[in-house]
Amino acid sequence: MSESKENTIVLISCVKRKIDTTNGPVPAKNLYDSPLFKKSLQYAKEVLKVGEDRIFILSAKHYLLPLNQPILRYEQTLKNASAKERREWADIVWQQLSKRFSADTKYIILAGKNYLDNLIGSHRISNCQLPLDGMPMGKRLQALNKAIMNKTIL
């Protein structure tokens, strides 16, 4: 990745596994407790060398979520959402991205099908890389582990 990281945004999907927040909100980056989320974040920071201010979580509940945004545990997913609900979710996320970033922003998206389907395309995110696209969960984790270990970009 030779171009400037200043024009690159990494989007990581939220995950089901979360820590307990009965003692109060925690930064979003600390809420999600799955190996896939942790490795995705590690990959973005250590291999892609993107700063935390350029990494966001695609949250089924909170839409575009900065890593340090304090939040409470929640149970919401796009997995069981209707096609209409997923389109509405993508509309909101796209509006947030459009307001925040320029049209020439490059996105690296580490997310599954439910998060990608309505978010990428000619009228949405078109300048993107999907390094984990089409991989089952276990293969994603393997690919991230290997990339982190070898410091190679997927």
Residue ranges and their predicted role:
Residues 1-154:
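Peripheral peptide segments
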